[in-house]
Amino acid sequence: MGCGGTLFYPLLITLSVALITYNIIISANAPLKQGFPGRSSSSDISIDPVIELPRGGGSRNNDGKRIRLFHTAVTASDSVYNTWQCRVMYYWFKKIQASAGPGSEMGGFTRILHSGKPDQYMDEIPTFVAQPLPSGMDQGYVVLNRPWAFVQWLQQTDIKEDYILMSEPDHIIVKPIPNLAKDGLGAAFPFFYIEPKKYEKVLRKYYPEVRGPVTNIDPIGNSPVIVGKDALKKIAPTWMNVSLAMKKDPEADKAFGWVLEMYAYAVSSALHGVSNILHKDFMIQPPWDIEVGDKYIIHYTYGCDYDMKGKLTYGKIGEWRFDKRSYDSKPPPRNLTMPPPGVSQSVVTLVKMINEATANIPNWGS
């Protein structure tokens, strides 16, 4: 290969960054008019008509306080693994929304299904069908479909609410969520493993020094985030392009690994001048967080392993365990065994909530 091989990757990265810069300029001046490269028309993209009608962009309650509604959106594939989580998530969304009363700021709900075709749960969960990335473009990193799915949904759907909550299938809402965004700022959960300062050298390819200090990049992913709809319409195309460029960049891909798409969102939000209020009380992540407390969401991303005395055995399969990954090819059964005495309240609550959902969702396990 010689010199040509040596220059190929730097040249590819340079071109990718140039494309990102171009898209930032375009999206800042003409939000969401661009489509995915290579697609001649948005008419090729199927839209599922079964979408819950939102309750409106905003209103006032009896006290005269303005209700700033947000629409909850969850991206998912059509895998068994994603599907059972979405069914549980939507069950609790409906129940918590109903319990909140007329002053709730929780508006409509959409599952953004990036499989490219409808599935059997279209009537159960309000769903928009998005096209996946062209074959091979995700390079085995299926999460890259998330920003592209959001671009399609924002472009093709009449969303009545003025704000969007980006959530995930493995989120369970435990109490009514208010609109935490304000004054042009988004609201987001800070992740300890998103460290812009540590990776400044890599991030400067995508967030140049002229844009300001690297600390302008918040330590967040795209979820959970509440952000203005108009702001997200600008951020989403940039998020898509930065994600794809980072995945093609060996240095960025190695540095960020499985959280690459999270860094891409944080960078894109900063590029468009959208800072975020960091809310540690947005969610908990059992088993590390032991109490639900005043948090809004349980995120069950980690496995929960305990011995029969209630002692955590993380890193070792426990005598009692709950790990969503145990149910990648079939849904968890109804009436999961409750954890033994001594297990943290957060884990007990998680299992109780999953059991309630599966007991009440029709045709569970079908």
Curated annotation (Swiss-Prot):
- Its transmembrane ranges are 6-26
Provide this UniProt record's keywords sorted from A to Z.
Answer: Glycosyltransferase, Golgi apparatus, Membrane, Signal-anchor, Transferase, Transmembrane, Transmembrane helix
Task: List the subcellular locations.
Answer: Golgi apparatus, cis-Golgi network membrane
Report the principal subcellular site.
Answer: Golgi
Cite the InterPro entries for this sequence. Answer: HPAT-like, HPAT/SRGT1-like
**A Pfam family recorded for this sequence:** HPAT
Q: Out of the domains of life, which is the source?
A: Eukaryota
Q: How does it sit in the membrane?
A: Single-pass type II membrane protein
* Species this protein is from: Arabidopsis thaliana (Mouse-ear cress)
Explain what the UniProt record notes about the effect of disrupting the gene for this protein.
No visible phenotype. Short-root-hair phenotype. Hpat1 hpat2 double mutants have longer hypocotyls, are early flowering and show early senescence in leaves associated with a decrease in chlorophyll content. Hpat1 hpat3 double mutants have an impaired growth of pollen tubes, thereby causing a transmisson defect through the male gametophyte. Hpat1 hpat2 hpat3 triple mutants fail to produce detectable levels of Hyp-arabinosides, have low fertility and shorter pollen tubes.
Q: Signal sequence span per UniProt? A: none
- What's one GO-annotated cellular component? plasma membrane
Q: Name one GO molecular function term.
A: hydroxyproline O-arabinosyltransferase activity
What job does this protein perform? Glycosyltransferase involved in the O-arabinosylation of several proteins including extensins and small signaling peptides. Catalyzes the transfer of the initial L-arabinose to the hydroxyl group of Hyp residues. Contributes redundantly with HPAT2 and HPAT3 to arabinosylation of EXT3.
Q: What is its EC number?
A: 2.4.2.58
Tissues showing expression? Ubiquitous.
Reaction(s) the record says it catalyses: trans-4-hydroxy-L-prolyl-[protein] + UDP-beta-L-arabinofuranose = O-(beta-L-arabinofuranosyl)-trans-4-hydroxy-L-prolyl-[protein] + UDP + H(+)
The protein's name in its UniProt record: Hydroxyproline O-arabinosyltransferase 1
